[in-house]
Amino acid sequence: MKIIAIAPRIGAAVLSLVAFSVMASTGERRSGAGSTFKVKFSDFQAYNYLIALNVILFVYSTVQLVMLVNSNHNSSFSSPFKWVLGVYICDQLLAFLLFSASSSAATASELSRHGLHNIWPPACATWKLWTFCSKAEAAVAMSFLSSFFIITSSILSGYHLSKVPAV
């Protein structure tokens, strides 16, 4: 059972680290109409939200991995039920928040790629920001995959919670 609990946490940690790293390196410089500008991930609130949640998930998953490997989850400062309940609540919260951040960033990427008829021009094509847009989309995809792993961890911690006697 321990391996089953560890695998999704490893997946969540690795993919959130990849999503964070790719998004943090997303930026592109363009020249046009006599001026030079740089587009960075930090210009988009949705991408900032995505980075913040992926960093939080990476730290949380890494701490959970260390505690699972060292079997310190039944520590003396808390009852097993309270500990498992806390893990379940954190897993649920992070799963919803990461899925929300990934959805927001996917919307920003979609608007950048295709625009919105008569309102928002397709930034990727208009300013030829192909590298920026491709890296942002890759980071969003990794974040969605990471959310799949934290959702799996949440399901497993819910199952574990149902097996621990309430005290």
Swiss-Prot record:
Instruction: List the transmembrane segments.
Output: 3-23, 49-69, 81-101, 138-158
One Pfam family matching this protein = CASP_dom
Q: Which domain of life is it from?
A: Eukaryota
The record gives the membrane topology as: Multi-pass membrane protein
Residues exposed to the Cytoplasmic side:
1-2, 70-80, 159-167
Q: Where are the Extracellular topological domains?
A: 24-48, 102-137
Any idea where this protein resides?
A: Cell membrane
Swiss-Prot/TrEMBL keywords = Cell membrane, Membrane, Transmembrane, Transmembrane helix
Q: Where would you say this protein principally sits, based on its record?
A: membrane
GO CC terms in record: plasma membrane
The entry's family comment says: Belongs to the Casparian strip membrane proteins (CASP) family.
Q: How does it assemble?
A: Homodimer and heterodimers.
Q: What is the official name of this protein in its record?
A: CASP-like protein 3
